[in-house]
């Protein structure tokens, strides 16, 4: 079940990264205001 949730999370990140219309401040967790999807 843990692996499934991790795979699902990476799937969501891949979709968000591939979407040119996604804003730069995609909320990944509750209190993240200015998240960078790529993490840099």
UniProtKB/Swiss-Prot annotation:
Highest taxon in the source lineage: Eukaryota
Coiled coil: none
Membrane-traversing stretches: none
Annotated Gene Ontology cellular component terms: extracellular region
Gene Ontology biological-process annotations: innate immune response; response to mycotoxin
UniProt keyword annotations, A-Z: Disulfide bond, Immunity, Innate immunity, Secreted, Signal
Keyword Lipid metabolism: no
Propeptide stretches in the record: 19-23
InterPro entries the record matches: Bomanin
Location in the cell: Secreted
Keyword Signal listed: yes
Signal peptide per UniProt: 1-18
Disulfide bonds: 32-35
Pfam families: DIM
Main location: secreted
Family: Belongs to the bomanin family.
Functional description taken from the UniProt entry: Secreted immune-induced peptide induced by Toll signaling. Has a role in resistance to bacterial and fungal infections. The strength of antimicrobial activity appears to correlate with the overall level of expression.
Name the UniProt record assigns to this protein: Bomanin Short 6
Species name: Drosophila melanogaster (Fruit fly)
Upper taxonomic lineage: Eukaryota, Metazoa, Ecdysozoa, Arthropoda, Hexapoda
Gene: BomS6
């Amino acid at each position: 079940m843990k692996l499934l949730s991790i795979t699902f999370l990476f799937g969501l990140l891949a979709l968000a990264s591939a979407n040119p219309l996604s804003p730069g401040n995609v909320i990944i967790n509750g209190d993240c205001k200015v998240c960078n999807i790529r993490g840099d």
